[in-house]
């Protein structure tokens, strides 16, 4: 299944994308769940699977995509998790996952503009795989970790590099308003049993900037879930963003920065393409 959050006629909604149509889950869960996160928490994927065969209620062209989980309680992001990216940033391979958080209003949905901040010219792209948790997870083993996943999506961890360097923590450079993107939808695990086989590609104005197998992660998806669940109680709808491969703008000579008028795309095999124009912020 492809599960999406969106706005239609000025109202928030969520549903199942089937071809060029959308099965309206907001209407079917009215009074019982107000978001995809609430459906995952209260009903799980089985109820969505039961409704997946319903006829579409409207077309994809009638919606404006929102972030897949716009109300995620936890948005945990992983830094320096592919060796080529570690090298281009002049870092050493970490002994444990490097984690930081993003705020909900720092991300937008597919097709929505990323805002290049007026405070900096160093606005960089980072194509990444996002993991959406499907059920409560605490102190889970690496061997069982994938049992707790609802599905996967594309993520652009847009980064303002000079602000990222303002402190040892990445928070300022990772949380400018509308600087990152998440979407277009979540693809459930029955369609992606092994995320290591996915291929990730980032394009800027049509030019390939990043291309890597998710199987090259230093800390893979099960390791990340197991590690995060040691200190956090992961809940349905929580998101772990797994890190970016080499090829970021900051690592190029000369550096390449996103600017208003650009279009950036993150494509992951088996999921789809997250595309966003860049506008002045």
Language-model-detected regions and their locations in the chain:
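Catalytic-pocket segment enriched in acidic/His residues
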Residues: 9, 46-49, 56, 62, ...
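Well-ordered beta-strand scaffold positions
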Residues: 20-21, 105, 207, 271
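Structural signature of FAD isoalloxazine-binding scaffolds in flavoprotein oxidoreductases
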Residues: 93-110, 125, 259-270
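RNA pseudouridine synthases
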Residues: 133, 140-155
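A generic local secondary-structure boundary/capping motif
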Residues: 4, 65-67, 87-90, 114-123, ...
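Short, structured patches in soluble enzyme cores that scaffold and shape functional sites
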Residues: 5-7, 102-104, 125-129, 133-135, ...
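N-terminal non-catalytic cap/leader segment that marks the start of a structured domain
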Residues: 1-97, 265
């Amino acid at each position: 299944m492809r599960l999406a959050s969106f706005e239609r006629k000025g109202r928030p909604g969520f549903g199942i994308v089937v071809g060029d149509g959308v099965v309206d889950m907001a209407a079917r869960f009215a009074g019982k769940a107000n978001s995809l996160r609430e459906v995952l928490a209260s009903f799980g994927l089985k109820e969505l699977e039961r409704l997946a065969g319903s006829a579409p209620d409207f077309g994809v062209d009638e919606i404006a995509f929102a972030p897949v989980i716009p109300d995620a309680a936890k948005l945990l992001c992983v830094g320096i998790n592919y060796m080529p990216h570690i090298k281009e940033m002049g870092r050493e391979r970490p002994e444990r996952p490097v984690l930081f958080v993003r705020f909900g209003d720092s991300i937008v949905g597919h097709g929505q503009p990323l805002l290049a901040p007026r405070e900096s010219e160093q606005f960089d792209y980072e194509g990444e795989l996002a993991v959406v948790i499907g059920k409560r997870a605490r102190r889970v083993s690496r061997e069982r970790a994938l049992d707790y996943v609802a599905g996967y999506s594309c993520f652009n961890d847009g980064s303002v590099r000079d602000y990222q360097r303002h402190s040892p923590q990445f928070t300022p450079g990772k949380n400018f308003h509308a600087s990152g993107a998440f979407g277009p939808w979540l693809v459930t695990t029955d369609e992606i049993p092994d995320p290591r086989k996915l291929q990730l590609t980032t394009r800027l104005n049509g030019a390939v900037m990043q291309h890597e197998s998710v199987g090259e992660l230093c800390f893979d998806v099960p390791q990340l879930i197991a590690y995060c669940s040691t200190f956090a109680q992961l809940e349905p709808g929580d998101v772990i963003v797994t890190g970016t491969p080499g090829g970021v703008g900051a690592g190029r000579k000369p550096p390449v920065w996103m600017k208003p008028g650009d279009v950036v795309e993150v494509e992951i095999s088996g999921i789809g393409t997250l595309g966003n124009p860049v506008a002045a912020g």
